[in-house]
């Protein structure tokens, strides 16, 4: 079974406004509402690819109810913990001459709520996959990812971590199955500027030395790199296409890698599927579908 954790899910309200101006009434030309959050994106793409997962995390109020409704409508199973104080956040994404975002805070998550999450994690068993993705709300301990991995260390669970800076490096001693920084985040960790794929491989191996089993590094238009636990190194150029929406591309890469690995047990195949899933989402207004991913795979095999 696959589980994803999104600590602070959102309802993303995306509006397109022609020539937006401050201080006057602006009218939208297009608007979209969808559930947001990195773990939620992973669960959504997994469902599109034919893999069931359960989305975990915390929701509150009428916004939380709508997040759950929209996910269930997409066929995504949810088991969010209801939080009594506050309301799940609404994030406004304004697209005009420039793109701007206003992100909400989210509910007040208390110790009792966190204990309920640990009780859910007790139900995980050998061979399960757990995806920890995104930031941690400031109302929760900053050590949350590390605490979860410590809590589960006696179980043979494949844990995937898609986070930045300390959230990522602090979990390395617990040997996560997969981590997915981008090239800029990788450079920030080591205080260097990453200039090419050879640099990526060099510093990805340093993360392996610190405990990561597999390191998948996205490089936007420059492609991606995988350094796997069996000593293999894989490089890929970026598939060719017109970028329409970069939101969720990294999460889609994680979902593609997980589904590819579970279906084949082969790191190269997982890497190919991850890269093409991430790109398929970037080339679409919405998150990638299985048909879009497979079509991109068929015409991109020369890139690997």
Model segments located where?
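Conserved phosphate-binding/catalytic region of the ribokinase-like
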Residues: 197-304
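Conserved phosphate/ATP/ADP-binding segment of small-molecule kinases
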Residues: 146-230
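Charged helix-capping and loop-helix junction motifs
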Residues: 115-118, 142-149, 195-201, 235-239
């Amino acid at each position: 079974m696959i589980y994803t954790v999104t600590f602070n899910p959102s309802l993303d309200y995306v509006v397109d406004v022609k020539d937006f101006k401050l201080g006057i009434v602006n009218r939208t030309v297009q608007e979209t509402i969808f559930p947001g959050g990195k773990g939620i994106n992973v669960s959504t793409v997994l469902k599109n690819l034919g893999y069931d997962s359960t989305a975990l995390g915390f929701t509150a109020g009428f916004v939380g109810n709508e997040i759950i409704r929209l996910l269930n409508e997409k066929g995504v199973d949810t088991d969010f913990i209801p939080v009594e104080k506050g309301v799940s956040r609404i994030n406004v994404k304004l697209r005009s001459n420039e793109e701007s975002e206003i992100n909400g805070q989210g509910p007040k998550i208390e110790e009792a709520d966190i204990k309920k999450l640990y009780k859910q994690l007790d139900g995980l068993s050998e061979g399960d996959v757990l995806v920890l993705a995104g930031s941690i709300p400031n109302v929760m301990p900053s050590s949350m990812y590390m605490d979860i991995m410590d809590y589960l260390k006696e179980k043979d669970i494949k844990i995937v971590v898609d986070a930045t800076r300390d959230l990522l490096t602090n979990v390395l001693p617990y040997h996560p199955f997969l981590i997915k920084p981008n090239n800029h985040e990788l450079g920030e960790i080591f205080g260097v500027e990453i200039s090419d794929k050879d640099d990526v491989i060099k510093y990805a191996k340093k993360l392996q030395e610190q405990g990561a089993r597999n390191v998948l590094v996205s490089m936007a238009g420059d492609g991606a790199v995988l350094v796997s636990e069996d000593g293999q190194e894989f490089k890929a150029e970026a598939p060719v296409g017109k970028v329409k929406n970069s939101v969720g591309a990294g999460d889609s890469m994680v979902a593609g890698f997980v589904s590819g690995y579970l279906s084949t047990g082969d790191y190269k195949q997982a890497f190919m599927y991850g890269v093409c899933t991430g790109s398929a989402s970037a080339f679409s207004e919405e998150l990638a579908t299985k048909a879009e991913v497979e079509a991109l795979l068929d015409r991109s095999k020369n890139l690997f």
